[in-house]
Amino acid sequence: MQKILYLHAGAEMYGADKVLLELIKGLEKDAFEAHVILPNDGVLVSALEKVGAKVKVIDYPILRRKYFNPKGILEYFGSYNRYSKQIAKYAKGNGITLIHNNTTAVLEGIYFKRKLKLPLIWHVHEIIVKPKAISDFINFLMGRYADTIVTVSNAVANHVKQSRFVKNDQVQVIYNGVDNAVYHEMDASAVRDQFGIAQDALVIGMVGRVNAWKGQGDFLEAVTPILKANPKAVAFLAGSAFEGEEWRVDDLEKAISDSPVAGQIKRIDYYSKTTELYNMFDIFVLPSTNPDPLPTVVLESMACGKPVIGYRHGGVCEMVKEGENGLLATPNQPAELSKAIQELADNTEKREQFGKASVKRQKELFSLQSYIRNFSELYKKY
């Protein structure tokens, strides 16, 4: 039996968190034993325990911007050494046979590769472009220490392979999958009532972390002319910020309140029943201003039968087939994004056609079953 130690960067329930949960939930319990160490407590802890994982919280450092200064570097490496020793003790005590680093922000897997001689799978959910020094540093570490670098899309794989530190045969693409038992089409009339949205309203929705690059600002700029022209249209945003970055939500709330169509814009924090939200939307929009590796929210909205609009970069280009299940705009061009939204806002038939194609494409290319099978086969190689 493979005893796998998963190292992850948080305990919330966003994209990479959900992907980890679904993987562990789907693994054969007689072939794999999942151990997860998280840097903090949160909703993910109990969710993982419910699917059979052994979970421990140890306050190990996650590579964040706050460490990108001389004082921060010293603080990071002091914590890194101290907590890595604790995790190594856990790994030895529990007979761990394989390490799965679930993000580039977690570097502790290197310690166990070096000290315990355990194979290391590095699961890359990010496309890190800036700062270039950090991108080069992480690629160097992955190239030197990872036995296999798993990327969530070809966009991520191509980015990683550009590094002189990474060998092509180190990299394997495994698409994330979503559970169609959870994400599926459903009647959303009660959800609209819950949020005070008319049944005949056109709802343009966005779900995503409020951070520097998910594109909430571009979303607001793009939907404003559409809301002005259609008093029955509603823009709906859902998502929270990282701890310590709550000011981003304050800025977003101010932008909404200052908008000339503020009465047609609704925003909520993280919402656990996202299936309800997707089904309430007529159009799903994710205008990430940096290349998004393979945004889980896009897959979830596709599974719920929604047309998708986004920017033409990153993994979205592999999820959305333009003119078939969605439309893409030139990155960081809100006016062009607005035209794409308007095209679907004006055409009910096209929205329905794209929505059906979204479900078909998600089931064919991004199924949960293929995601779990591909990882199981990789684990068995070690």
PLM ranges: what are they?
Residues 96-97, 279-293, 306:
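Acidic donor-binding loop of glycosyltransferase active sites
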Residues 307-310, 320:
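Short hydrophobic beta-strand element within catalytic cores of glycosyltransferases
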Residues 29, 158-163, 169-170, 177-194, ...:
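Acidic anion/phosphate-binding donor-loop and adjacent secondary structure
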Residues 190-193, 336, 343, 350-365, ...:
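A short, well-ordered alpha-helix in the C-terminal region of glycosyltransferases
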Residues 43-49, 236-262, 350:
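Short, structured helix-loop element that forms part of the nucleotide-activated donor/catalytic region
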Residues 244-249, 261-271, 277, 327-328:
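Active-site donor-binding acidic/aromatic loop of nucleotide-activated sugar
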Residues 322-323, 327-334, 343-349:
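Conserved acidic donor-binding segment of nucleotide-sugar-dependent glycosyltransferases
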Residues 17-22, 202, 206, 211-225, ...:
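A conserved mid-protein helix/loop that constitutes part of the nucleotide-sugar donor-binding site
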